[in-house]
Regions:
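Polytopic transmembrane helical bundles with strong interfacial aromatic enrichment
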Residues: 2-148
Length: 148
């Protein structure tokens, strides 16, 4: 009987999760990069000739901070292994970036006010992300466990 092709090979969940860790690391780095690009661009946009609005400055600082949170979540997944809580933390960080920071950018740069009501949900997503991260780290597995 022929051996199964790689497309039909099943992998345990623990082997699949590091791909998620890698993506959270990559997306965290890209988000950090875009926050620097946006900071520089916003400083020179004619629409902000009178100064960058406080809401945009807040969005930038929150994007930078939560980009680090994404990087940390990716590292935690690498160290702790498969964890639904850590996975949820990463996704909630991403949702928060979209609903909070990118929504405020669109609102102030493009005058796009369509999803203004979703901004607080981005903040709520970040709160839940940090709680999920705490639970995931507290449960621990792999090289990081409860005895450490």
């Amino acid at each position: 009987m022929p051996s199964p092709s790689p497309a039909h090979t099943s992998f345990p969940a623990a082997q699949v999760w590091p791909l998620s860790a890698r993506w959270f690391l990559v997306l965290g780095a890209i988000s950090a990069c875009t926050s620097v690009v946006f900071s520089a661009a916003f400083a020179h946009l004619p629409v902000f000739a009178g100064g960058v609005p406080t809401a945009v400055q807040t969005a930038l600082s929150q994007q930078q901070f939560h980009s680090l949170g994404l990087l940390f979540t990716g590292l935690a997944l690498r160290v702790c292994g498969a964890s639904r809580w850590l996975q949820a933390a990463g996704w909630l960080m991403l949702v928060g970036l979209l609903l909070f920071s990118f929504n405020l950018y669109a609102r102030h740069v493009l005058a796009w006010d369509t999803f203004r009501a979703l901004v607080p949900w981005g903040g709520a997503a970040w709160i839940l992300a940090w709680l999920a991260l705490a639970v995931g780290l507290a449960q621990g597995s792999g090289r990081f466990n409860r005895q450490s």
